[in-house]
Amino acid sequence: MVSRRRLLAATGVALVAGCGSGSDAGTATGDGGGGEAEPLVVRPSGFEDEGTIPRKYTGVGDDVSPPMTVESVPANAETLAIVLDDPDANDYLHWLIWNVPADTDEIPAGIPRTETVDSLGGARQGTNDFGEIGYRGPLPPEGDAAHTYQFSTYAVDTSLELAAGADRGELDSALDGHVIDRYPFVGTFDR
């Protein structure tokens, strides 16, 4: 039986491959070998990969974004983009943020729900599936089994020319041909 983690990883690899420009020159594979660029590693703080997301970062808690540690970024990345969705609820979208400077070491908790985030070099946020700008935490239906929430961070070779408030489809289109690497991180939550 294929584990959820392997399925999500395979989906992510397919997504990154689909975002390519058709040329793999200068593209990091994340395997760290053969002189390739340093792989992307960005992790939320306060819980382990595949662990339970602390209540304060959920819709039944303080509903604030978790702090994220940027451990390594490919040298040719200019910006980062982060997408948080729930694959157990038809990829229900909880957060879109892009144009985070690649030299950022830490993304603090509680990013304001504003179109532009001045504290992150003017990063922009998009519209989630709640119809709002910014982060909205996990909020699975009561009684459901734990849902899986995937934080996908993308290393991007440019600053995206995409207006704040954009939706997932618009971000995916803007990323096309500009993704260098992707780092998936999974958390779970139930109520």
What are the roles of these predicted feature ranges?
Residues V2-L15, C19-R191:
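N-terminus-centered regions that define maturation/targeting leaders and the start
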